[in-house]
Amino acid sequence: MEKFINNAPFALVLIFLVMGFVLLIKGADFFVEGSSSVAKRLHVPSIIIGLTIVAMGTSLPETAVSVSASLTGNNELAVSNVVGSNIFNLMVVIGVCAMIATVNVAEETIKRDIPISLVCAGFLLLLGIVGLGDKEGMILGHFDGIIFLCAYAVYIFHLIKTALKASKEDGKVEIEGGSDEDIKLVSVPMSILFIVGGAIAIAIGGDMTVDAASRIAGDLGMSQTLIGLIIVSIGTSLPELVTSIVAARKNEVGMALGNAIGSNVFNIFMVLGIASAISPITIVAENIIDLCVLIVFTVCVWIFAGTKRKIGRMEGSCMVALYASYVVYIMIR
């Protein structure tokens, strides 16, 4: 695939990039639907399905891109894809939602999820600079990846324990992915087909996206960091943006911020954890700057959310404007 894309006309490379996005997004949808159906047939509680399979499914495109980039030595793309996606989810997806309809913020999002998200970004910054598992800094090595994966396992165990307790006390708890009725049951053969077909589509889409993005960066004289921060991260996050806009128009954005924060935690701990555990990832100076920007933006959203327990049109406009300013900065730096 890489050899073919490198020798293809530029217009065809752009088509391959779009095709890669489509395969990633649709593959993730099929994989989640098949996995959720199997889990439901095995009588796995919907709370656990929502917090694991469904929540992770939204980040499968980022996972595929970063793992593929890590394996092919495109380290800048592996990190910038995750950081760029986190910034886009936080500032644009939530910002646009807030511009359409007020986003109410749950107390646990302010007291638990946003602080954990800040710890994640700070932890990545620390490991990126120090490189605890390697002799030299600026590298996420195998040991660092294992640390990330273990940290996420503890985090998800805490979420499941908390959700199950809330479910017993209140009889119902909101989760990403919705309630029992939102999980479609399909036949076992069809579920297996969805899982296998979705996984294949994700793998092919990840390789296609990375190869096309690398070729575009080379032809336009742009760094892989820039391509990852803007084009790839936005492409893999478009489903969340479209879904959030539709929900905002129906005034159903109560879980929007919590879901975005949860996705950001997954992207850092699991996506980069898997990628670096498979193949060490080099951190470049630009990644450090972008991580600092992510931390600053997260603090801004924390302040917006904490003042009135909601994010309104004014705050949403500020968030989108901050993101636009950031894009201008990374294009001229």
Enumerate the predicted regions with their spans.
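Hydrophobic alpha-helical segments, chiefly the membrane-spanning helices
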Residues: M1-R333
